[in-house]
């Protein structure tokens, strides 16, 4: 199991910034020889779970992340009918092709500009009676009257291919194409999807997270109030693949009762629950019937719990202790919160997490549900907010009477409005997944691990000063 460099854990708790991994002798020759799949029942083939945050987890995010091997957990405040629609949408998506934004020929340039950035590939497909007739790029819309019809500006010189064409062939066809996106059609000529050159490469690297029927996987969260069992059953009937019982303070009797109620239904789905930061909390949740425990109180970017209450724990130490306790009972943990760099993912996995939950980092992507906005310097951003914030509480308590709703809104513990800028080099969630998995694969080669279990077994972790952490930062502007 993971050990500390000097053989002894320090007498104080640690964050991800406080620690580093020491390289070991390795026989792993290539990053592509590393298996990133997990064994916690979630079905992920990369250790990435998207947090159940309204500003992050929607159907575009769910489709895209599952295609690359992760899974999205839909937020608990999403109504059951909306969950059903989202699950049906995601499970009907192609395992290779992206679902494009579509426009009718008479839609306006203004309509196109509002929709193009819903997807990272940067185009919208103009369709007539289900068949593609052109592509619209952002550059096509610049300097054009916003009421112009898209049929008048659509690009008609683009690569087409039948659905089922090998991604490598699509890659080759796009080498000298004027638009870096191929449009694929079914036998009757109707639109099947699109694929970019980068998407074609990714199709050969990632394995989609799929259910027993070969469809993309998706999860959903439920809170601990009301008839939790009925809500969980409704989510299972909607077709979700993973259930998450979610509350800020998971180590309470109400959470344990909710876990027992859902576990007793025997729905045949993996059950995650949280959040906790101690071995005792982990054991209690697993004994109540959870298969996976979510670990983290206060490390998230949108969370103010520690500053409001003084409650929480540095995340690396919390993950390390809880993972050890879970392993003794045959359970697993997800490291939830505090992830800002690929190294943090690697450290959480080295400490024993089976998956890492990411929220705010993914809010600043094309695939997150929010609208793309621009600041005064024309830099793109999206809004994010915490799930215990006033904004989220108001949305979640919409069915309450006005007095109760106002009373609950007084006790928010999160940021209601935050700007997450889109990285110009990594604007899509797939770009961030590439960034993360590349880092974790490299970690494994440095450690001599061919899979995540071996990473945890072989990792040697040291403790560093703030200056040590700063030393590891690149200096692109020199010094």
Swiss-Prot record:
Catalytic activity line of the entry: IMP + NH4(+) + NADP(+) = GMP + NADPH + 2 H(+)
Active-site residue numbers: 303 (thioimidate intermediate)
Domain of life: Bacteria
Documented EC number(s): 1.7.1.7
Binding site for NADP(+): 246-248, 296-298
Keyword Magnesium found: no
InterPro entries, A to Z: Aldolase_TIM (IPR013785), CBS_dom (IPR000644), CBS_dom_sf (IPR046342), GMP_reductase (IPR050139), GUAB1 (IPR005991), IMP_DH (IPR005990), IMP_DH_GMPRt (IPR001093)
GO BP terms in the entry: IMP salvage; purine ribonucleoside salvage
Cofactor(s) annotated in UniProt: a monovalent cation
Gene3D superfamilies in the record: Aldolase class I (3.20.20.70)
Metabolic or biological pathway, per its Swiss-Prot or TrEMBL entry: Purine metabolism; IMP biosynthesis via salvage pathway
Record domain CBS: where: 96-153, 154-212
Cofactor binding note from Swiss-Prot or TrEMBL: Activity is highest with Rb(+), followed by K(+), NH4(+) and Cs(+).
GO cellular component entries: cytosol; plasma membrane
CDD domains: CBS_pair_SF, IMPDH
Keywords per UniProt: CBS domain, NADP, Oxidoreductase, Purine salvage, Repeat
EC top class named in words: oxidoreductase
pH effect on activity, per entry: Optimum pH is 7.6-8.2.
Entry keyword Cytoplasm: no
GO terms assigned for molecular function: GMP reductase activity
Additional information: Was identified as a high-confidence drug target.
Family of the protein in this entry: Belongs to the IMPDH/GMPR family. GuaB1 subfamily.
Subunit annotation: Homooctamer composed of two tetramers.
Cited function: Involved in the purine-salvage pathway. Catalyzes the NADPH-dependent conversion of GMP to IMP. Has no inosine-5'-monophosphate dehydrogenase (IMPDH) activity.
Protein known as: GMP reductase
Protein's organism: Mycobacterium tuberculosis (strain ATCC 25618 / H37Rv)
Gene it is expressed from: guaB1
């Amino acid at each position: 199991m993971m050990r500390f460099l000097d053989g002894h854990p320090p007498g104080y708790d640690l964050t991800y910034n406080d620690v580093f991994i020491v390289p070991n002798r390795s026989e792993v020759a290539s990053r592509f020889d590393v298996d990133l799949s997990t064994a916690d029942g979630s079905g992920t083939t990369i250790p990435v779970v998207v947090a159940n945050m309204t500003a992050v987890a929607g159907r575009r995010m769910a489709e895209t992340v599952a295609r690359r091997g992760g899974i999205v957990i839909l937020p608990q405040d999403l109504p059951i009918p909306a969950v059903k629609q989202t699950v049906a949408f995601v499970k009907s998506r192609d395992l290779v092709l992206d679902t494009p934004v579509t426009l009718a020929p008479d839609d306006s340039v203004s309509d196109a500009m509002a929709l193009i950035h819903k997807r990272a590939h940067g185009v919208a497909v103009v369709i007539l009676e289900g068949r593609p007739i052109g592509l619209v790029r952002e550059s096509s819309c610049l300097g054009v009257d916003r009421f112009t019809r898209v049929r008048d500006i659509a690009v008609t010189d683009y690569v087409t291919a039948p659905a089922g064409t090998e991604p490598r062939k699509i890659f080759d066809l796009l080498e000298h194409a004027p638009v870096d996106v191929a449009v694929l059609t079914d036998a009757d000529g109707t639109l099947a999807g699109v694929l970019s050159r980068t998407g074609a490469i990714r199709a050969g690297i990632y394995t989609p997270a799929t259910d027993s029927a070969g469809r993309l996987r998706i999860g959903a969260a439920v809170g601990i109030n009301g008839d939790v069992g009925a809500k969980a059953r409704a989510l299972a009937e909607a077709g979700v693949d993973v259930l998450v019982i979610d509350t800020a303070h998971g180590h309470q009797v109400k959470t344990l009762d909710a876990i027992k109620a859902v576990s007793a239904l025997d729905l045949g789905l993996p059950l995650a629950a949280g959040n906790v930061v101690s071995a005792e909390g982990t054991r209690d949740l697993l004994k109540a019937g959870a298969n996976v425990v979510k670990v983290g109180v206060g490390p998230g970017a949108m969370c103010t719990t520690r500053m409001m209450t003084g409650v929480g724990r540095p995340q690396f130490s919390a993950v390390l202790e809880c993972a050890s306790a879970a392993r003794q009972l045959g359970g697993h943990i997800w490291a939830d919160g505090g992830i800002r760099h690929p190294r943090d993912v690697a450290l959480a996995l080295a400490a024993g997490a089976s998956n890492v939950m990411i929220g705010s980092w993914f809010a600043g992507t094309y695939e997150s549900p929010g609208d793309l906005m621009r600041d005064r310097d024309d830099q793109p951003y999206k809004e994010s907010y915490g799930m215990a914030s006033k904004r989220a509480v108001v949305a979640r308590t919409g069915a309450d009477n006005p007095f109760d709703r106002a009373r609950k809104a007084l006790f928010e513990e999160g940021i209601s409005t935050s700007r997450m800028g889109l990285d110009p080099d990594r604007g899509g969630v797939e770009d961030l997944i590439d960034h993360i998995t590349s880092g974790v694969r490299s970690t494994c080669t440095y450690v001599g691990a061919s899979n995540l279990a071996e990473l945890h077994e072989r990792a040697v972790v040291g403790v560093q000063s703030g200056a040590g952490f700063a030393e590891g930062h690149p200096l692109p502007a020199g010094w």
